[in-house]
From Swiss-Prot:
The keyword Glycoprotein does not apply. Residues 23-201 form the Peptidase C3 domain. It holds the Pfam family Peptidase_C3. GO terms for cellular component: host cell cytoplasm; T=pseudo3 icosahedral viral capsid. The active site is at 62 (for protease 3c activity), 93 (for protease 3c activity), 169 (for protease 3c activity). Disulfide bonds: none annotated. Its EC number is 3.4.22.28. This is Genome polyprotein.
Length: 205
């Protein structure tokens, strides 16, 4: 990728400075990632994946999962994959996956919002081999709405000030007690997450 020239020093521990900055949001994020996040590889790269409930998880749409994915280095079959669009067929940049595994995810639907949320203090949590166990205070999150994301008109975008880099997609945007969205891109100095809304995971879907 664009950052292959970077040295391969991997900080394994989240820094305490960030913990102090964030307090409860940071603690919530660490607990959420420990229980519900995994590192996933598709043929399009490596991503952070968040498990939502039962055997359903979410990835950025551009991860384009195939019939199977590597989840924490284990091959796992994908039984179903839905690319989300709004009622007008506009891209929402999220793919919901149903995994072929016995273990169920802890149900976190109660932490998802019913509509796009703006907050003053958020944390972006990433866990991949390039960015292991990384928690970044991104401050204020605003409801950006419509964005042309890499040439694709995309809706329900949340924006924050953060110099994003390739390889952080799938990162989980959180505030205290809330899972706000999934990081899907950036323009160098702003990051964008797809709002992760509760009704995407209604049983009837």
């Amino acid at each position: 990728g664009a950052y292959t020239g970077m040295p391969n020093k991997k900080p394994k521990v989240p820094t305490l400075r960030q913990a102090k900055v964030q307090g409860p949001a940071f603690e919530f994020a660490v607990a959420m990632m420990k229980r519900n996040a995994s590192t996933v590889k598709t043929e399009y790269g490596e991503f952070t994946m968040l498990g939502i409930y039962d055997r359903w998880a979410v990835l950025p749409r551009h991860a384009k999962p195939g019939p199977s994915i590597l989840m924490n280095d284990q091959e796992v079959g994908v039984l179903d994959a839905k690319e989300l669009v709004d009622k007008d067929g506009i891209n929402l940049e999220l793919t919901l996956l149903k995994l072929n595994r016995n273990e169920k995810f802890r149900d976190i639907r109660g932490f998802l919002a019913r509509e796009e949320v703006e907050v003053n203090e958020a944390v972006l949590a990433i866990n991949t081999s390039k960015f292991p166990n990384m928690y970044i205070p991104v401050g204020q999150v605003t409801d950006y709405g419509f964005l042309n994301l890499g040439g694709t008109p995309t809706k329900r975008m949340l924006m924050y000030n953060f110099p994003t880099r390739a390889g952080q997609c799938g990162g989980v945007l959180m505030s205290t007690g809330k899972v706000l969205g999934i990081h899907v891109g950036g323009n160098g100095h702003h990051g964008f997450s797809a709002a992760l809304l509760r009704h995407y995971f209604n049983e009837e879907q």
